[in-house]
């Protein structure tokens, strides 16, 4: 039962004489005394004694039905996987055979300026032969290059009407600033 300790002089003062729920907080009206709960009193503590925790209450360190975070487990060193590039560079061989990678360009988004060649070809001799022969002549016709006209006409310079919109704004032939950063002024510079 709730009791108030006596104060000096035997008067209670403004202290409550009964608990907030009245003498009995039993709402269902059973005359039996309330059985003490199996849980230990939370306010009672024993620093030197073992803590008594009920075995049937789940721990709240892990989410229900989920995987534990592993924070409170024994500390085991986490092994990180290291992805090292092979000495020859990265390869696209998914089967793991040791194929050396071709020489990489400076940037992967730049277009490749080389052509993959078969194993038996010699690229240097073909390139030298192609450069030494004029564009309008074939390898067998050395003297007829002057007689035949150029095989390819030069493309005309792009005009304003043939401009493609994906290449940016149309080229302008004047120096007039249409939208200056400070706003338009009444003075026109031609």
Swiss-Prot record:
Annotated region Disordered: the residues are 1-190
The annotated subunit structure for this chain is: Monomer. Dimer. Interacts with TPCN1.
Q: Which domain of life is it from?
A: Eukaryota
This chain is encoded by the gene named: JPT2
Compartments reported by the entry: Cytoplasm; Nucleus
Query: Which InterPro entries does the record associate with it?
Result: JUPITER
Q: What is the lineage of its organism?
A: Eukaryota, Metazoa, Chordata, Craniata, Vertebrata
Tell me which family the UniProt entry assigns to this protein.
Belongs to the JUPITER family.
* Protein name as it appears in the record: Jupiter microtubule associated homolog 2
From start to end residue, where is composition biased (Polar residues)?
A: 35-44
A biological process from GO: regulation of calcium-mediated signaling
What coarse category fits the chief subcellular location reported for this protein?
A: cytoplasm
Q: Which GO CC annotations does the UniProt entry carry?
A: cytoplasm; cytosol; nucleus; plasma membrane
Say yes or no: keyword Acetylation present.
yes
Is the keyword Nucleus in the record? Answer: yes
Please report the organism this UniProt entry assigns to the protein.
Homo sapiens (Human)
Provide the positions where the record notes the PTM N-acetylmethionine. 1
One Pfam match, given by its short name, reads JUPITER
């Amino acid at each position: 039962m709730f009791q108030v300790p006596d104060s000096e002089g035997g008067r209670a003062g403004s202290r409550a004489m009964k608990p907030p729920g009245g003498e009995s907080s039993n709402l269902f009206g059973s005359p039996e005394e309330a059985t003490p709960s199996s849980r230990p009193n939370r306010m009672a503590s024993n620093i030197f004694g073992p803590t008594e925790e009920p075995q049937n209450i789940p721990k709240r360190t892990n989410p229900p039905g989920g995987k534990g975070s592993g924070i409170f487990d024994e500390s085991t060193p986490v092994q990180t996987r290291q992805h090292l590039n092979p000495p020859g560079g990265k390869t696209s061989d998914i089967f793991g055979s040791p194929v050396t990678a071709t020489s990489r360009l400076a940037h992967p988004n730049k277009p490749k300026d080389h052509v993959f060649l078969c194993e038996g070809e010699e690229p240097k001799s073909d390139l030298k032969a192609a450069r030494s022969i004029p564009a309008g002549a074939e390898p067998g016709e050395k003297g007829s290059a002057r007689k035949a006209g150029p095989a390819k006409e030069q493309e005309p310079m792009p005009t304003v009407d043939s401009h493609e919109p994906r290449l940016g704004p149309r080229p302008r032939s004047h120096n007039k600033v249409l939208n200056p950063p400070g706003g338009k002024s009444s003075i026109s510079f031609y």
